């Protein structure tokens, strides 16, 4: 987008190559259906649409091109070797790479301010909040309810993206704190197929980091000012 080689409303066409099973709804549409890039990017994050992810992989030059770009960004553990859903687990990444990719965007090292804002908007659409957000809420204590709303009441916001292939679960996100500062967290757990202990471990790890994300109380500032008047 920043280089002008892709527009946010450019249509991407559904082909047999990119249709992926599993999560998402785009695979159910007829071949030849065209989706604007902004919808594809949003659905990739919002509902983890595998076909949407494949559409973007194809449009951005394919697996080898993306892998070279990941390597140039210092994401050495991240490699795309197969189209999604990749149930065999041939694609790879690390918690460090997940955290670094978010940090690169948030610090402005990888994207312009406008593209960074688009990134945040899209990340904010993710509907899965049962791992990192739920764990953080648990660690903060107090009222426990729906994670996003309950965190917002406490002054926190988590822009996160989850992923799983049954034997591995991940959640990474940008955490906005009550004092305006931000933090990045990423978790990646491998375990037995569909083992609930994997997701619970992510929640426990997120809860354990909560104490260090509690900002120091702000010093109250008086709005009153004193003035002397000569008689």
Predicted regions and their residues:
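A mature extracytoplasmic/lumenal domain signature
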Residues: 12, 16-18, 84, 187-189, ...
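Structured C-terminal helix/loop/strand segments within mature extracytoplasmic catalytic/sensor domains
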Residues: 5, 59, 104-231
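Conserved catalytic neighborhood of penicillin-recognizing serine enzymes
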Residues: 17-55, 63
């Amino acid at each position: 987008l920043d280089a002008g080689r892709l527009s946010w409303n450019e249509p991407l066409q559904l082909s047999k190559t990119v249709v992926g099973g599993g999560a998402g709804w785009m695979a159910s549409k007829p071949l030849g259906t065209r989706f604007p890039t902004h919808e594809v990017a949003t659905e990739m994050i919002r509902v983890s649409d595998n076909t949407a992810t494949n559409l973007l992989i194809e449009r951005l030059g394919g697996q080898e091109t993306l892998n070279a770009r990941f390597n140039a960004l210092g994401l050495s553990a991240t490699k795309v070797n197969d189209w999604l859903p990749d149930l065999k687990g041939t694609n790879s990444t690390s918690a460090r790479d997940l955290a670094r990719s978010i940090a690169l965007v948030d610090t402005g090292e990888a994207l312009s301010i406008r593209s960074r804002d688009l990134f945040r908007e899209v990340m904010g659409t993710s509907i899965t909040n049962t791992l990192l957000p739920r764990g953080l809420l648990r660690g903060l204590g107090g009222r426990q309810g729906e994670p996003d709303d309950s965190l917002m009441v406490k002054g926190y916001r988590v822009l996160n993206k989850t992923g799983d292939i049954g034997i591995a679960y991940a959640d990474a996100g940008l955490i906005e704190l009550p004092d305006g500062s931000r933090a990045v967290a990423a978790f990646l757990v491998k375990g037995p197929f569909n083992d609930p202990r994997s997701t619970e471990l992510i929640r426990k790890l997120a809860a354990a980091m909560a104490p260090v994300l509690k900002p120091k109380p702000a010093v109250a500032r008086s709005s009153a000012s004193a003035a002397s008047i000569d008689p």
